[in-house]
Amino acid sequence: MKNFYRSMVATWIAVLISTSVIRATEPIDIGSRRELLVDHHLIERLDGVRLELHRPVRREVVFRPDAAWEGNGSGYQSVFQDGDRFRIYYRGGHHPNSKAYKTSRNSWETLCVAESKDGIHWTRPELGIVEFNGSTTNNLILDAAMVSDFGGSPAHTAVFKDSNPDCPPEERYKIVIVGRNPKGLYLMVSGDGLHFKLKSEKPFATEGAFDSQNLMFWDSVGGVYREYHRAFEKGGYKGVRGIMTAVSKTPTSFPKPQWLKYPNATEQALYTNQIQPYFRAPHIFMGFPMRYNDRGWSPSMTKLPGLEERQHRAKQHPRYGTTVTDAAFMTSRDGMTFHRWSEAFIRPGPARQDTWVYGDNFIFWGMVPTKSHLQGAPDEISLYATEGYWEGNATSFRRYTIRMDGFVSVQAPFSGGKLLTKPLKFDGSQLEMNFSTSAAGSVRVEIQDDAGKPVTGFTLADCNEQFGDQLERVVS
């Protein structure tokens, strides 16, 4: 059998990795796929090393939804690469409880789209689909009138490009949208991602609250559609905000949903879920939920920016002024049980205008590869998050970047350490490793037999010392 193990192991100092492939216990068959060490699924033991969550780098504001039909209520964005361009779908309009809405009265029951060639510079296409103030020269693709038959809410949507190879071309693009008649999640379809129609008058999900961004995608590994939506633990709108899921072979009908599980995690109100297959390792599901934290009024709360607007929102409901939000990170191998990190993936950051508000750090659903700002460096992953939700006249779309596969790493101190995997079965002829060391750090790899003894020719002594910073170094 040829030996192949592709692992994401990033360390900035030194780590020794002991990889076990043949042991008495049943091995985990990883084939020839890329594996990320985002959890303990493949790890038997850590000696002197630890798993560390990495946070993306805050970059520039790439877009502001400040057109007359847009505003500070823009949210529930979806982003994906579509051929040679990128698309962001987002809610337009002002938040109905904001000061700006009192004067403009532009409804947030709209869906807009922006496009980009590089994921950094975004423009509004002039589509001629929806009329606003007597003109169709805008980037609107949906308004409330277009979905009134089923009480659809363009303010609560998720848009995706269906990767199911059997999907009809005229239904390649899909919108998950909340409807009221009857209450549930509905599916809209399109062949171009701009002109959508209702797929079925019957909702595909009816058990849940749905007052959030609810989503669906094709799981290419499992060969099923997965849907994730908002629900409350006590039913209706009572209790802690949580996430339910269901799977189906068809996107138009799902069985009774089940609650996600988070072993060893503290209870946390999760406002969104943003779950998706990781595009470089689609057997791993990643979620970036927005965490909802009502901190109440305190001297510290009054020290945060935007006190006047915070107090204005609190007059409508106290939590509108006292809730602050950030983004978390979680992963799953089965789409149901998630390892959720307690630390924030994106924090509110330095206290400044349009930060530390309810809806801040809402990560868009989706991630895309973009060029590094360093010439000659490999591509990075770009994520996007909202700032300034329901403040001022518009939100801001902030870009964040993170290393390819670099969400979590195995990290060691200068004194070094070891990682021993569980028994593995794999195919291939070489090992590739995503890693980073200091100028003084290094990595070595060893293969052991079922007794924990090094396999001749694959010992630490046989492995050349690896140092540097590369995404796909072939270990020799």
Question: Over which residues does each language-model region extend?
Answer:
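Carbohydrate-active catalytic/glycan-binding domains of CAZyme proteins
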Residues: 1, 24-476
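Aromatic (phenylalanine/tyrosine) cluster motif
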Residues: 4-5
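Bacterial N-terminal signal peptides
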Residues: 8-19
